[in-house]
Design a protein with these regions (language model features):
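Active-site-proximal beta-strand/loop segments in catalytic clefts of secreted hydrolases
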Residues: 99, 167, 226-229, 267-270, ...
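Catalytic His-Asp segment of secreted/periplasmic serine-dependent ester chemistry enzymes
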Residues: 273, 280-281, 285, 315, ...
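N-terminal secretory targeting modules
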Residues: 43-226, 232-240, 257-259, 429
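Bacterial N-terminal signal peptides
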Residues: 31-40
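Bacterial N-terminal signal peptides that target proteins for export
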Residues: 3-32
Length: 430
């Protein structure tokens, strides 16, 4: 308070001489300003007078999309959902982010809790914590809005299985979700079972409704990967965390000391495009250009960005609606500029081969090669991740190496994702 009033006095003394005032009136105005400031500060709650100096970093994240064409698997009536995610980095305080971005009505969360998962839907003893929102046990999230929980003390190890439980009173449809979680989560029988160590499971889901981030306090920062199905881990083994970003998270834990370990945040959406939305598939999400602020810049602690998106633009191009190299370069340059403005380093990933896939053509392969040449040689990225070279068949570079092909000639299998995660270049933490 004393420092504030001293500063106010000094400011007033600098300002007031610029206007002709009598000494008495000058003293009166100065005293009035100081009294008003003192009254204002006295009326503020203690919490409002202090700054949160924590350094929050995302440890897990998913990009929301939707709504799904069939909403029935993601409709809840007075039930608890227990969502299972895996941390990348650890900490001793945690918080979560929820989203009702695509909802048309307010979303009521009656209660929320977090803990380490033991197995199945069970929470490990001694780790269950209640989450609050502005000090309250529940929160109503307006249509189109996100919500951030209050921090809670919880020792979260890196690479830990985490259970986030949300009680949804009333009837709720989940228009905001990540549709291809490749992870089993759980839906309870009727009622608030957020505090139950073992959930009374009615059914399971393989999506992450509403939950978009798990954050920890005190880590150095995060690598955000903006991508499509290859980032989302399409056709990898479910419930095994075999996405290439999971491999990268394990590498960072093994190869770096604690001060240089970065969170790894997967913002991939299967079917996602660089330049335009896919109106035929709502679960493919908004284009990378459209979702960049939400999924990259708003990620707590974002320090590095991997751009691994564009093959869906090429594969879905047509004679009536062609995509050109200039279009792709303009899109990449826009994302690079927006990342650099936020002091985020950008790693460009080349596009993987897809000969034999349903969307393949010779013309599209020519464009893919041109895009990859630009990514490798333009010098516009801080580093290049040559995913094409990792995954391609040396004997036929337009197709995936058979040992890495999941069978659809577009998406890798677990071995292919492992190879990607091991080949990803590591930049210095910054």
């Amino acid at each position: 308070m004393n420092r504030f009033l001293s500063a106010l006095t000094a400011a007033a003394r600098r300002l007031l001489p610029q206007v002709y005032l009598t000494p008495a009136l000058r003293r009166l105005l100065l005293a009035s300003a100081m009294l008003a400031a003192a009254i204002t500060l006295a009326g503020q709650p203690a919490a409002a007078q202090s700054w949160d100096t924590s350094h929050w970093t995302a440890s897990w994240g998913a990009a929301p999309a939707g709504p799904p064409a069939d909403a029935s698997p993601h409709t809840f009536t007075d039930q608890t959902v227990r969502l299972v995610v895996q941390s990348s980095v650890g900490g001793n305080r945690v918080r979560i982010r929820l989203s009702n971005e695509l909802g048309s009505t307010p979303l009521r969360i009656g209660a929320a809790r977090i803990g380490l998962r033991a197995q199945g839907s069970d929470v490990a003893p001694g780790t269950d914590r209640a989450l609050t929102f502005g000090g309250r046990a529940g929160v109503t999230i307006p249509a189109g809005a996100p919500a951030l929980s209050d921090p809670v003390e919880l020792h979260l190890p890196p690479l830990a299985q985490v259970a986030v439980s949300l009680y949804l009173p009333g009837a709720v449809q989940a228009p905001t979700l990540h549709g291809q979680a490749r992870q089993t989560s759980y839906v309870s029988s009727t009622g608030d079972h957020t505090a139950s160590a073992s959930l009374p499971v009615q059914r399971t889901i393989t999506a992450w409704p509403f939950l978009t981030a798990l954050e920890v306090d005190g880590m150095r920062g995060a690598v955000v990967v903006l991508g499509d199905a290859l980032t989302d881990g399409a056709r990898s083994t479910s419930d095994a965390n075999r996405r290439w970003t999971d491999v990268l998270a394990r590498r960072l834990q093994a190869e770096r000391d604690a001060g240089a370990r970065l969170g790894v945040i997967n913002r991939g959406i299967a079917g996602n495009r660089l330049l335009a939305d896919n109106p035929a598939n709502p679960l493919a999400g908004r284009s990378a250009l459209a979702r960049f602020e939400r999924d990259v810049l708003a990620t707590s602690g974002a320090r590095q960005l991997v751009l691994m998106v564009g093959i869906e633009d090429i594969g879905n191009g047509s004679a009536a609606n062609p995509v050109t190299l200039d279009d792709m370069v303009a899109g990449y340059r826009q994302l690079i500029a927006r990342a650099r403005a936020a002091r985020i380093a950008v790693i460009g990933a080349t596009l993987a081969p897809f000969e034999g896939a349903a969307l393949y053509s010779v013309e599209k392969e020519t464009l893919r090669q041109a895009v990859n040449t630009w990514i490798r040689s333009s010098g516009e990225f801080d580093a290049v991740f040559d995913a094409d070279r990792v995954l391609r068949d040396p004997a036929r570079p337009s197709r995936l190496l058979p040992a890495y092909d999941s069978g659809d000639h577009l998406h890798p299998n677990d071995r292919g994702y492992q190879a990607l995660g091991e080949a990803m270049p590591l930049l210095d933490a910054r």
